[in-house]
Amino acid sequence: MAVEPSGKLIVFSAPSGAGKTTIATMVLQRIANLSFSVSATTRKQREGEQDGVNYYFLDKATFEKKIEQGGFIEHEFFFGNYYGTLLDATESVLASGKNLLLDVDVKGALNVRKLFGERSLLIFIQPPSMEVLIERLQGRGSEDDAALQERLERARFEMSFADQFDTIIVNNNLTAAVDDVEAAIVNFIG
């Protein structure tokens, strides 16, 4: 008989440029019993990255086999590579009593809700406006016009799902957004 996991899942979704990664990093420093979920990917390992720390690096055939076997909570194909959250790694962390923070797209977040129900808290990080989002993405200087337009289309798509999340945090002020996210998580995990 399986032991019921005691940890909970906190799921972050946001359009690129909304500040999700920054908020997640700050919240992880503030909440002791919260770990960051390590995703699996088929992208090439970059210098300085460690397997099992930054990502679980899998080849395409292994990743696709795990998809067929139901080995992912969620997965997506994005910019030529697979990314996903491994079911066994997630269950292992939850069974240890730790809470887990996942950074996934909106469809992945909704799938987490289907699988984990009330043991999951879905938080959507939203930019104050599309204009601010455009400024943030342009400020990165890492996107050409075509890539920027693609990210903006994806942002509009992702923002259309925000009302299906438990909490929407508008990142107009980083300190306030981090405080609001922390309060929502602490309230949820007890």
Swiss-Prot record:
Name of the protein in its database record: Guanylate kinase
Q: Which domain of life is it from?
A: Bacteria
Subcellular location per UniProt equals:
Cytoplasm
Query: Which residue intervals define the domain Guanylate kinase-like in the entry?
Result: 7-186
Q: Which Pfam families match?
A: Guanylate_kin
Task: Could you list this entry's UniProt keywords, alphabetically sorted.
Answer: ATP-binding, Cytoplasm, Kinase, Nucleotide-binding, Transferase
Q: Could you tell me the EC number(s) of this protein?
A: 2.7.4.8
